[in-house]
């Protein structure tokens, strides 16, 4: 048989074509014939082996192996495991090594056996010091047993050739049954071999200092043997070993160090007992395990009890440490939510406990109002009582819990005489959820400074000028600069406005891309392509643009343009030396505003004038700022209240940040003298010297449900703008948001955020133009530093830094959340932090992904975090595989290295948010989503670019629906039928982003019914050519619609408008208008439209009826160079507030100015604003020619550019 295989292999190689040449048809046919012949030979060979082979019949004496070194044995096992893993990854049924799903589970069992056996060999080779012959016998036994593993699998594999079937299921079951039955005592005399080795290991326990059995996988071997071979005997032994297996690897090993030898002894005694039992039971069937225990003199039951007590103690300690100490009320909220989920999930199996669990739930609920009083009272004794509520419950079994809660409640009621002084500062939650902060930041006392800066920005000095502002943290440097940066009288004088924030830790690439994004437009095709170039996605070699190349692109963009650059938080002169070369001086009155805390840096950077030192507020200005923040446009009418307010403002040390924070406290209180006096007394006379004390006071008066939300900001980096949708998603996954009947969690979370904004703890950086909702925010450095430190003190959040020693990490208690910035940090310290509930990666370089060299290590390290609920890797860390064993995950965000999602993703049945990005995904290479995703019924947000379903036929057959799914992006459709099918499966969608290519439909303008709750729809055409949309969009509650790269005409938009009566925002980007570039808007179209944005549309003639757009507030035109004019009917739209024109024709500007004149003079609309962005046509033309030269790299430009 071997000779036959050798000859066949030689013949196949002889016809194998040169890999550098194309296959010839003849060779291809010969190749196919020989493959068929090989399949047939394999099948016949299996039949011969099957007739002769039986696992139990083979004896150790009949197998002689020359090399029985442990290294050789482990290498052979590694080859077996590797080959089996390859087989398990073959998912294409067309391949002849494809393993059907029902057989994979059996092969996984064989894999487990091999891995366990390999560990046993490794452990014995490193620990056993007994005579060599004992180990040689053991290694020989292990090698042959591994070979039997491989043989069973090989006979198990199907072979599809000449219609020959693989082994029948009954035959496979017989082989596996033989294998499973004999694997414990295995090859005779296997039992005596195991007993000899375990006795040898036991004798080395006092000498084994490096690695103990208790902390290693050796504990898996006896428990695995028990699960196969034992029935109900010595259940206590089984419970003990299960406890060790499931928990020891997650517990801090330093807490166990004084018990390791005892635990080793118990584990090895258990193994000796089990294998001795099998050895004797083979001779006497009625032998009991207890008899063997006495015969060996182990007395395992007595030895087990103290170990169990110790392990439970360590488990309790670790679990208590894992609970955050932010607020005691959160303990009960946490326990109540999990108790309800637990009862709902296991309602059938817990029927016998139903009454007890319901009583426990009732008692918990009754504790909440008492604990709220305790949580608000800072007295240490009450705080201890509060924490005891959770820690005492952990120790009790369910029979004792009810009695214990009753006792705790009684203790709390005894302390319910706490003074009511601080109750006035408790937030009125119902009103806070609806509150919205005024959009503009208040500036008081710097009118003279603002005017001076404005004059320097707009003076006639031709050369570049750097205007430096310096001052201590909290003075308002950034607020002041932002006011000028958003002042249209200033901004309109510059061609380009851009900004960046340096801070102490920064990345040149990050700063450059931030500036380029502002300079060329964040949503422009040019910016998107630049990002792809920067991260290497547009290069065959995946070469990233270096910082010098990006700096060159920035210089070319700024050259010959008049620009305004804002550079915030510069710490050293050397930093400015590195940055200044990015900004060319073309003698065109360009300006740079630089902000720093240090006078030396400000003086060093200034060019034509002295740096501006931002002074402190005087007493009168301090009171005015406090009054504005508390009373808004009104004033304080009470002289007594004003006197207290003046005293509080003075106590804040004339620092704007301190005043704003205290105003946040006062704004939530009753405007009574007694309440304000209480605040003044709590602040103390020392407050002006300690900004943290003011923040601490603001934190102290926060309602319990906001404290965790506020401290969670500590997981973000300094000077980073935080995306609100991402933040709210994390809050919800962390269970910070308390559910309220009939209200979406997102709405409640938005109320939480507005509350923090209203207290001046969070700064708004961007609001949605349509509805004013917050889209982005950030924290002041002082507040962020407080969050990081307080979160660490409260066991809430731990930052792992590159210079932190392992000893320091081990000394920490377990924290609820773990944040890190370097992949190596997570790998090195994962063992000491394995009980955390969240792992958050924060990159200093948000545009770039780290190298994927750690992908495999990171993926396996993540499996150590068994209780993980949130895994947020920010698309930065590439993982080798999705950790589908982390069953508690609710939030997963990562970058993957493959274009298919495994079907086992459905194992993450708790998952609510899934954000994945494949490094190679594109319109030509889509991500395949398995049909099992429809089993993930808790999924609420799914974000995977360019994904399509793996098996559309299976999707048709599967009637499951994702009722909770609210956000979906970005499915890729090529047929309208596919889109309809997807929409039927997601009936409650609220936001949908679609990628389509060459959409086909049997009916032109077929009405496609979108989910009734859909509010946001973005539709992108990814075909090279502009295509029509073969369906009308019907979505009765749609508020936001964006269409990009489509061919539209008046008829289509008119018919679609009939189905979109509640549309508020319409954006058309890179759209071709039919009818010779004409768009006719008739009466009744888009009656609720508030924002209309047209970008790079080939619109020449725009005909608008008189009564169209009755509610329009904003009109934005960009790149509409062929448009002749803005229709005159816009003059009579009374709701119009804003028109912006960018890259325009002169006739459009003239019509815009006429509209402005009419709005202001005739209708007295003094709030109307007209913004005209200047454009230099020569530079723009050069830029377009440069863009045209990049088409070979995949850029697709709009036809109006050509």
UniProtKB/Swiss-Prot annotation:
GO biological process, one term: plant-type hypersensitive response
Keywords tagged on the record: ATP-binding, Coiled coil, Cytoplasm, Hypersensitive response, Leucine-rich repeat, Membrane, Nucleotide-binding, Plant defense, Repeat
Its membrane topology: Peripheral membrane protein
Main location: cytoplasm
Subcellular location: Cytoplasm; Membrane
Pfam families noted in UniProt: NB-ARC, NB-LRR, WH_DRP
Domain called NB-ARC: residue spans: 426-741
Coiled coil: 345-368, 437-459
Binding locations of ATP: 471-478
GO MF: ADP binding; ATP binding
Extent of the LRR repeats: 865-889, 908-936, 1011-1036, 1040-1059, 1060-1084, 1086-1111, 1128-1151
One GO cellular component, as annotated: membrane
Signal sequence coordinates: none
UniProt record similarity statement: Belongs to the disease resistance NB-LRR family.
Task performed by this protein: Confers resistance to late blight (Phytophthora infestans) races carrying the avirulence gene Avr1. Resistance proteins guard the plant against pathogens that contain an appropriate avirulence protein via an indirect interaction with this avirulence protein. That triggers a defense system including the hypersensitive response, which restricts the pathogen growth.
Additional information: This protein is encoded by the haplotype B genome of the allohexaploid Solanum demissum.
Name assigned to this protein: Putative late blight resistance protein homolog R1B-8
Gene this protein is translated from: R1B-8
